[in-house]
Amino acid sequence: MSDLKRTPLCAQHLQLGARLVPFGGWEMPLQYSTLTREHRAVRTAVGLFDISHMGKYTLSGPDVLAQIQRLVPSDLARLQPGQAQYTVLLNEQAGIIDDLIFYCRSPEHWVVIVNGATNDKDRRWLAEHLQGVHFDDLTGTHTLLALQGPAAVETLQPLVDIDLARLGRFEHAQVSLAGKPAFLARTGYTGEDGFEIMSLEPEGIALWQSLTAAGVPPCGLGARDTLRLEAAMHLYGQDMDESTTPLEASLGWVIDWDKPDYFGREILLAQKAQGTERRLVGLTVEGRQIARHGYGLFDGEQQVGVVTSGTLTPTVDRPIALAYVGKPFAPIGSRLEVDIRGRRAMATVVKRPFYRRAL
C-alpha cells in the first residue's frame, strides 16, 4: 500500500484523466492533457491547479509578530492587514529552511503557506522557535486552489462578493465565494495574474467542480514547473536549500537591511559587504537539448557551476535554466558550456525572468 498522501481532490483528478506522480510525499497530478497545452492555457487565458498539498497554518497571539520577525529577513511589521509578503525562513547560518508567504490578517493573526515537501520540517522549526503562539495546522482540513492566467479575474468575479479589481498583488481578503467563506489571495507561482483560494474541504471540492465544469482547464505539476521557471521563480530543494543563503540564491530583495535582529543577519551583512562566491543566474542554452538539474557548467575544463532547474520553455521555445555559478561568471553575457550527457552546449547568462507578463 502506498505511503503517499492524497489531497481531497484526488478523486476529481482521476475522473479528469490525470496522470498522478509522487511529489514531496504526495500523489499529485502531473498533467491532464499535455504539459504544453496546460502551460499555454495559463499564459493565454486561465488554468486551475490543486495545490492543497502545501502547508497551511494560522499563527495567533499577542506576541506573534515579534516572534516571527526573528525567523525571516523581511520586515513583516511593514505589512498592513490584508497584505502579504514572500520571504524565506532562515537558520542560524542564514541557510534557507524554506520559502513561504506570510499573510497579515492583523498584527496578532497571520496565515502562513509553506511548501508541501517541507511542511513537516517547517512545522517543527516553527514549533521550536515560536513561544506562546497559538499554532493551527489547516493542511488536513482545507483545500488550496490556484486559478492563474490573464482571464482569472473575469473567471472568478461572478462567484465572489468583492470587486477583484480592488484586490492588489500580494493582497488578500476573507470573502464569500459561491456563498461559502474562503480566504482569497492575489498570489501565484506562474508569472501570471491570478488567485490562490483556501477553503474548507467540501467548499474546495465544490469550487473545483464548478470551475472545471465551466470549462476552466485543470493543470498539473508539469505546467506549474515550466510556468514558474519561465518566471524565474525558485523551487525549494532544487534552486535553494539550507546550504544556500538568500544572497547566493539571488533573493536579496527579500532582505530588509535595516531590520535589527533575525537569524543569520551577521552572515548576510558580511556577504553583502564582501560578496558571495557563487550566485544563482539565468541561462539560455543553444540548440534544443535541456540542461537539467545537476548538470555541470564549464569554462574550458574547469567546472564553474551547476544547473539547478532547466526546461524547454513552451512560451519562449528555447532551453532555459537556473544555475549556480562562480562570481566571475555571474555577469550578464557570460558564456559557459553545459555538459549534457557527455556533450557540450553553449550557454549564456541572461537577465531574469525569461518571461514577463504584459501589464
Swiss-Prot record:
It holds the Pfam family GCV_T_C. The gene is gcvT. It catalyses: N(6)-[(R)-S(8)-aminomethyldihydrolipoyl]-L-lysyl-[protein] + (6S)-5,6,7,8-tetrahydrofolate = N(6)-[(R)-dihydrolipoyl]-L-lysyl-[protein] + (6R)-5,10-methylene-5,6,7,8-tetrahydrofolate + NH4(+). This is Aminomethyltransferase. Keywords: Aminotransferase, Transferase. The glycine cleavage system is composed of four proteins: P, T, L and H. GO terms for biological process: glycine decarboxylation via glycine cleavage system. The glycine cleavage system catalyzes the degradation of glycine. Its EC number is 2.1.2.10. The keyword Ligase does not apply. GO terms for molecular function: aminomethyltransferase activity; transaminase activity. InterPro entries: GCS_T (IPR006223), GCS_T_bac (IPR022903), GCST_C (IPR013977), GCV_T_N (IPR006222), GcvT/YgfZ/DmdA (IPR028896), GcvT/YgfZ_C (IPR029043), TrmE/GcvT_dom1 (IPR027266). GO terms for cellular component: cytosol; glycine cleavage complex. Belongs to the GcvT family.
